[in-house]
Amino acid sequence: MPFELSVSLTTLGILAVVAFVAGFIDAIAGGGGLLTTPALLTAGMPPHLVLGTNKLSSTFGSATAGFTFYRRKLFHPRQWTHALICTAIGALVGAVVAHYLPAEWLNKMLPVIVFGCGLYLLFGGTPKAPLDVDVPIRKKWQSPQGFTLGFYDGVAGPGTGAFWTVSTLLLYPIDLVKASGVARSMNFVSNAAALMVFVINGQVDWLIGLCMGACVMIGAFFGARTAIGGGAKFIRPVFISVVLALTVRLAWQHWFGQA
């Protein structure tokens, strides 16, 4: 029996609520997979379907959030063409490599790296006010940044939004709100590219993924608008809270062998 036919309406409702909350949080600070992946596993979905199904729903959310930032003129694709292209390439390569490469060493390093991102945003000197929109964005770092983070998202995924936000703040003269717009947009590119590989390999539960995707979209819409309206003062504490939760979750899972 297909998995979706064995899911009760109550379970489906719970997954929908989790997806909405995940979309809201992910649009602000990333880390939505921290909620949706365990929820799918708890619902009894076979592990080989969880990653692909989660990518499907995440793609809807990152598309909605990214487009919201774009419409508010907080993300300009023409300034980021190198990053967009290399992110897509990296995600495709990463998703393919994920089928053959043991990721145990990477998993054990993740909590430390993610926690480092949180510490940087907590103590680092990030811009407090919006910067000039016409400041040129250097192309020099876009290709390596895009390929590296796209590859990582294809291979693993947790913390990708945090990595995008912090690395963008470090490399370019933009504020936290615009860095969040870049992160959400690049997340969409890597999600969509990696999703193609999961679809080809038949690792997506379409019914569950589309239902959750719709709820993630709604959550992402409100989350992105909240982030833009609240600015850096709102994003910073939410981002740090999500990073700390993600650190605990990853450490528990990969250091202590707990699900």
Language model features with spans:
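Residue-level signature of the transmembrane alpha-helical core
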Residues: A16, F20, F24, K55, ...
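Membrane-interface alpha-helices at helix entry/exit sites of multi-pass transporters
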Residues: M45-N54, P77-H82, P173-R184
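Hydrophobic alpha-helical transmembrane segments in multi-pass integral membrane proteins
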Residues: T148-P158, A194-G202, L246-Q258
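Transmembrane helix exit motif
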Residues: A63-L74, A95, A103, P111-V135, ...
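Selective hydrophobic functional segments
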Residues: G52-W105, N191-S241
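Residues within membrane-spanning alpha-helices of integral membrane proteins
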Residues: L12, K55, L110-V114, G118, ...
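Cytoplasmic-side transmembrane-helix entry/capping segments in multi-pass membrane proteins
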Residues: P77-C86, M109-L110, V133-K139, S180-M186, ...
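Selected transmembrane alpha-helices and immediately adjacent juxtamembrane segments
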Residues: P2-P46, L131-S180
